[in-house]
Each structure stands twice: as structure tokens, then as C-alpha cells.
Curated annotation (Swiss-Prot):
Family label: Belongs to the Antp homeobox family.
Cellular compartments annotated: Nucleus
Superkingdom classification of source: Eukaryota
GO cellular component: nucleus
Cited SUPFAM superfamilies: Homeodomain-like (SSF46689)
This protein's UniProt keywords: Developmental protein, DNA-binding, Homeobox, Nucleus, Transcription, Transcription regulation
The protein's name: Homeobox protein Hox-B3
Amino acid composition bias (Polar residues), ranges on this chain: 44-59, 113-122, 134-164
Main location: nucleus
Gene Ontology MF, one: RNA polymerase II cis-regulatory region sequence-specific DNA binding
Lineage of producing organism: Eukaryota, Metazoa, Chordata, Craniata, Vertebrata
CDD domains noted in UniProt: homeodomain
DNA-binding positions: 159-218
Biased composition (Pro residues): 81-90
Length: 399
């Protein structure tokens, strides 16, 4: 309505010329050039007259756009002047000024005293220009414009984006997808958008909101379990589960390496079990010699037994000498480790209680053959248990 009233007033003014200094030459096309006195007399006859000429220039703008003053002046000329009722001046002023809409009160900013006939039809004021907000409001809700031409303020609810209402089928699919994957890649998001008839933006926003909801739920569960113990209905939060699983894994790893010590000292046959358990330390030492090629740890025990050397250092460092290395370390290191110093060394012949019968000294083979001094010193040593037949490790058949 604002634009229509403005252009109607411009067409009314466009066909007429301002004949007087007051600018009120709008009585009709038959009398375009009228003297000022005649215009004032005709203007006093109208229903919208004013008292003083000083007020006429001020209120002429509003009466031009008012509906009661925009009818043509031809019927006024045909009617006799006494038929027009004399207007009450103050009331008509107030009603004419109050009936003007607030939006259209700003329309004629051009002063009527200055003659601007060509510029009236082309001038566009700032409030008439189309803005981005106005175009959005027109496209979304065309009924927001009121009858007086005033538009709703931009911060009202009509300018906000409408809330997306998801159907139950869409929510089921979205929840199912969120259960398997909390973050969607773009190809999967495009596929979900085509499947559910939604836009990618809607799916992305739904997943963002769902992640925030999940985070809030986990936080509330964590606070509830820390204050009042774990809830009976729900599982503990995911960080607590992962830490518990990690601790369990560490516990199983440590329990694998905590091998129980053999009950050798509690058995009646202390000598046999003491020597068998003593094999473990030389095995570790021999493996270290095998892989690191360093000097053997048990050099003072291995190299000399009762003042007799059992081999060169090169042979002792080699893997072939491993079997002999175990046996050589027995007489000096074994009894002293377990506090069996009171036992003489010649009792080693009676040590094997559960193994097969002993082999004669002539049948020693493997690394024990090239050492005749070894068999002479220890004729009754159970070499089949000490790694004589298997240089890689001892056969502990009685355990």
C-alpha cells in the first residue's frame, strides 16, 4: 500500500503545474493555471480545510495522500457551494492527521514548494529498497505485511528457521546409524540424505546434536557412578571400561611372567631337586652368552672345577659347549646357592631318583665326548638329564 499511494500521488501531481506560490493547483485539468486567491477560495470549500495559510503548507502533504481528499474536483464544482457543510476546524485536523498510517507519513519528503516534476516519479527512498531480510520475509510468509504497510520486525519468530520435524522412520534410521558410527563421512551422509528424503545439512546437524546428547549422558552417568556407585541399569562409561580392560590385560601379562618357584626344598629328595632347579640359572646365562657373544657369567665356576680346566674360552662361548657348560657349573655353584654346603660332592652319583638308568661313561656323546677328563671326574653324572643328549636344553622328565 505504501508504494501504491506514493505512485498515485505522483501521477496526480505529474499532470498538473504549480500555478501559485502555495502549490495547491490540484482543482482539475480544466483550470491548470489559476491565481493564488482563487485556489485559496476553492481550497476553503473542501472538507479538509484549515484555518491559517501557515498550517496549510505543513498539512498539504498528508491531505494529498488521504483517501477523503484524493477524489477528483469535478463533482465539487458541479455541486453548489452551500451544500458542503462547514467543517469544524480542530476536530478535522486531528482526525485527518491521526488517520494517516505511520508508514505512509514519511512518504513525501520532497517539499511541495519547490517545483520538481521530473524527479518525483523516479526518486526511490531508502525504506522502499529491497533488502535481504525483506525478500526472505516475502518469500517465506507473504502475510507478514500489515494493511498499513508496516512489516514485522526482523527479530520476530517469522524470520527464524522452521524446526525440522523428523518422522519416526527417519529417527529409527538415524539412531541406527549413530549406534554404529557417531561420525558420518560425506558419501554416507549423501546416501542417508537420499534414503530419508532429507538434506545433508539436516543430517549433519542431527548428528551434532545427537553427539552432544550422548556426551551429556555419559557425563551424567560418570558423575552418578562416582557419587553413588555404578548404576544397576547402565554400564560404566567408556573411558572407565577402557581403563579397566587395560588393567586386566596388564594383570594377565604380569601373571604369565610370575612363574611359581618349584617346590624343591620341601620334598624329601632335596639333593636331586636342588640340582634340577639350579639348572635354570645356567640356562639363562648360556642363552645370554649365545645371543650377546659376551664373556660367560660363570667363568670362575665353569672354567675350573677342582683345579681342572674343562675347555678353552672359545669353546665355552660357542653353542656346542652349552651342554657341558651346564654340568660344569653344577659342583661349585649348585650346593652353595641353596645352603647345601654340608653335602659332599660325591653324593651327586645318587641324585637321580626318578629318571631312567644311567648310561655308562663310554656312551657319552655330543659335547661330552671330546673331554675325557670330564667323564673320569664324574663317572656317575646323569648326563641325559643335564643336556648331554640335547644341547639346546635339559630334559626335565621327572617334574
Amino acid at each position: 500500500m505504501q508504494k501504491t499511494t506514493y505512485y498515485e500521488s505522483s501521477t496526480l501531481f505529474g499532470g498538473y503545474s504549480y500555478g501559485s506560490t502555495n502549490g495547491f493547483g490540484y482543482e482539475g485539468p480544466q483550470q491548470p493555471f489559476q491565481p493564488g486567491s482563487h485556489v485559496e477560495n476553492d481550497f476553503q470549500r473542501s472538507a479538509c480545510s484549515l484555518q491559517s495559510l501557515g498550517n496549510t503548507t505543513q498539512h498539504a502533504k498528508s491531505k494529498d495522500l488521504n483517501g477523503s481528499c484524493m477524489r477528483p474536483s469535478l463533482p465539487q464544482e458541479h455541486h453548489p457551494p452551500p451544500t458542503v457543510s462547514p467543517p469544524p476546524n480542530p476536530t478535522t485536523n486531528s482526525t485527518s492527521s491521526n488517520s494517516i498510517p505511520s508508514g505512509s507519513a514519511k512518504v513525501p519528503r520532497v517539499k511541495p514548494t519547490s517545483v520538481q516534476t521530473p524527479s518525483l516519479t523516479k526518486q526511490i527512498f531508502p525504506w522502499m529498497k529491497e533488502s535481504r531480510q525483506n525478500s526472505k520475509q516475502k518469500s517465506s510468509s507473504p502475510s507478514t505485511e500489515t494493511c498499513s504497510g508496516e512489516k514485522t520486525p526482523p527479530g520476530s519468530s517469522a524470520s527464524k528457521r522452521a524446526r525440522t520435524a523428523y518422522t519416526s522412520a527417519q529417527l529409527v534410521e538415524l539412531e541406527k546409524e549413530f549406534h554404529f558410527n557417531r561420525y558420518l563421512c560425506r558419501p554416507r551422509r549423501v546416501e542417508m540424505a537420499n534414503l530419508l528424503n532429507l538434506s545433508e545439512r539436516q543430517i549433519k546437524i542431527w548428528f551434532q546434536n545427537r553427539r552432544m546428547k550422548y556426551k551429556k549422558d555419559q557425563k551424567s552417568k560418570g558423575m552418578g557412578s562416582s557419587s553413588g556407585g555404578p548404576s544397576p541399569t547402565g554400564s560404566p562409561p567408556q573411558p572407565m571400561q577402557s581403563s579397566a580392560g587395560f588393567m586386566n590385560a596388564l594383570h594377565t601379562m604380569s601373571s604369565n611372567y610370575d612363574a611359581p618357584s618349584p617346590p624343591s626344598l620341601n620334598k624329601p629328595h632335596q639333593n636331586a631337586y636342588a640340582h634340577v632347579t639350579n639348572y635354570q640359572n645356567p640356562i639363562k646365562g648360556a642363552l645370554q652368552q649365545k645371543y650377546t657373544n659376551t664373556a660367560p657369567e660363570y667363568d670362575p665356576h665353569v672354567l675350573q672345577g677342582n683345579g681342572v680346566a674343562y675347555g678353552t674360552p672359545s669353546m665355552q662361548g660357542s653353542p656346542v659347549y652349552v651342554g657341558g657348560n651346564y654340568v660344569d657349573s653344577l659342583p661349585t655353584s649348585g650346593p652353595s646357592l641353596y645352603g647345601l654346603n654340608h653335602l659332599p660332592h660325591h653324593q651327586a652319583a645318587n641324585m637321580d631318583y626318578s629318571g631312567p638308568p644311567q648310561m655308562p661313561p663310554s656312551q657319552h656323546h655330543g659335547p661330552c665326548e671330546p673331554h675325557p677328563t670330564y667323564t673320569d671326574l664324574w663317572p656317575a653324572q646323569p648326563t641325559h638329564l643335564l643336556g648331554g643328549q640335547n644341547p639346546g636344553g635339559p630334559k626335565l622328565t621327572h617334574l
